[in-house]
């Protein structure tokens, strides 16, 4: 039996609201998004719809002792994504060397480098019969290349094991925020592996970085995305994510979208922050489905993104295959 890949949890995402359109990139306020009263709104309560593919994958994962972020994070979209034969894997170990206020993944000293992990992930992708695989990773500032080899080798292993399977990677910045030369050298390893989609999540506006993402820098993050666009093959799509509900203003959300577009990003996901525990960042507000639709309208129609996936339950890998298709980055076999 294949040794199981052991991922932990996925990042939780989120969204906000805005004001009347007078210029490109301005968002209409469609509903009241005042601070929440502690109760979860009805639109965040979903019904499980289990199709044949979902049942098949559930049985296979249990029989083979496999593991995915989808299960570990109790992602609400698992039924839909597995029905489309899409899943997400976390590589690089269980401990992250950075701490973000919204994230479930624990911070600590990482375990030793596991060079066999890429092969095991690829074997899992093959056994699950996936059409599209998303590979994310913890930050590994303890490694000279920030874990870039691990990401690149996972891409290569999946390509070899499952020809035609779409591959999207969501790594850290490989230390670019502190050492640009080393970060770009590491990034080039992933460039050479040619993922279909390269994602790096900015998550929140500049003002909130010191509080929410103290180990990252907003402007360096935008530079890193631009560097990825400049270095990656033209066919590779560049992607990012915004979490709203963490204290940002509506104008700041639109500003992030503008900045992302100006730095070569083609795909963006926007979803609701759901506070994992009392120890995590305080939830500021819930945003309605109508307001999420307005973010999508502004992003696609006014700012020119290839695809904006925006909704209360959206996570960064939600409908990842469809986004890749819309950006012309991947064609299903």
Show where each model-derived region lies.
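Short acidic active-site motifs
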Residues: 185-186, 208
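Auxiliary Fe-S-binding modules of radical SAM enzymes
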Residues: 1-87, 119, 123-126, 153-164, ...
């Amino acid at each position: 039996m294949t040794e199981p890949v052991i991922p932990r949890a996925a990042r939780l995402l989120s969204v906000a609201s805005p004001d009347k359109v007078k210029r490109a990139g301005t968002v209409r306020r469609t509903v009241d998004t005042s601070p929440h009263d502690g109760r979860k709104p009805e639109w965040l309560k979903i019904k499980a719809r289990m199709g044949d593919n979902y049942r098949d994958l559930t049985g296979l994962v249990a029989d083979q002792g496999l593991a995915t972020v989808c299960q570990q994070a109790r992602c609400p979209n698992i039924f839909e994504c597995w029905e489309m034969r899409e899943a997400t894997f976390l590589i690089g170990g269980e401990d992250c060397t950075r701490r973000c206020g919204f994230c479930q993944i624990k911070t600590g000293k990482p375990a030793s480098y596991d060079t066999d992990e890429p092969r095991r992930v690829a074997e899992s992708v093959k056994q699950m019969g996936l059409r599209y695989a998303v590979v994310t990773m913890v930050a590994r500032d303890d490694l000279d290349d920030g874990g870039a080899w691990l990401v690149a080798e996972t891409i290569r292993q999946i390509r070899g094991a499952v020809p035609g399977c779409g591959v999207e990677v969501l790594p850290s910045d490989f230390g670019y925020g502190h050492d640009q030369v080393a970060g770009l050298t590491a990034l080039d390893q992933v460039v050479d592996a040619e993922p279909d989609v390269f994602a790096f999540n900015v998550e929140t506006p500049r003002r909130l970085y010191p509080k929410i993402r103290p180990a990252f820098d907003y402007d360096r993050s935008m530079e890193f995305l631009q560097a990825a666009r400049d270095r990656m093959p033209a066919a590779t799509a560049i992607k990012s994510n915004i979490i709203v509900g963490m204290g940002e203003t509506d104008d700041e959300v639109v500003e992030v979208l503008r900045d992302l577009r100006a730095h070569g990003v083609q795909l963006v996901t926007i979803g609701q922050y759901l506070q994992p525990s009392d120890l995590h960042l305080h939830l500021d507000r819930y945003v309605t489905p109508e307001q999420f639709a307005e973010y999508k309208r502004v992003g696609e129609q006014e700012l020119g993104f290839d695809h904006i996936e925006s909704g209360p339950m959206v996570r960064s890998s939600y409908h990842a295959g469809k986004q890749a298709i819309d950006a012309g980055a991947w064609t299903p076999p």
